[in-house]
Amino acid sequence: MASVFSPVKEMSPEEYKRVTEVTYLGVVYGTLAALKRMLPRNRGTIVQVGSALVYRSIPLQSAYCAAKHAIAGFTDSIRCELIHDKSRVRVTMVQMPALNTPLFSWVKSRLKHKAQPVPPSFQPEVGARAIYWAAHHTRREVNVGWPSVEAIIGNKLAPGLLDRYLGKTGFASQQTCEPENPSRPDNLWQPLKGDYGAHGTFEQRARERSWELRASLGRSWIGAGVAAIAAAVWLASRRG
């Protein structure tokens, strides 16, 4: 994926085009390639990696947010077409929170201070477990971490209030106190050399587990438990 941390007024048309080509069209082209193999076999699951930003855009990442919105729209269209065709191929989206990945070390940035994942952040293994689970189940969407749930609820109930909140907090929450090096290399136009691994530089603050994810993946069991409790209460009231 590609992104740019920058105010809109400082972005160039070329940068928007590049982020769109890599982050959005990369998903489109990959999906088309997968469908060529999967449709004749009439089975399989395509897992699209989304973000909490699918539901709520934030300042300083306009190109990336727009690309993630586009991925969601593209995925919804595919899903409807597969249902119409009675295909057994499934499409799911895994909505990620902020993850401790090397993104923040190589992303192009015009910020005064180094970029950081918006707290609370999670280790990449949390996201990997969600993707693996989604590939083996038929869930339409999987939300990883409270930030994804918060974005959905907040933008549905009070989008205007969220605008003002992010206008006041969204700049500082995406930056550390450490000054950015304006001459450091980035991966917008070409990959950087070397293996950056899967983890970023925010090991101490990244969570290794997501209780929200556990609740989401186990919601059928939770529902069964609630139903069992309700049935027990009803029986007790009848006996009383």
Kindly give the residue locations of the regions a language model identified.
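Active-site loop-to-helix junction immediately N-terminal to the catalytic Tyr of the SDR YXXXK motif
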Residues: P7, S57-C65
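Active-site helix of classical SDR
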Residues: T31, A67
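SDR active-site lid
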Residues: H84-E178
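Hydrophobic alpha-helical topogenic segments used for membrane insertion/localization
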Residues: A215-R239
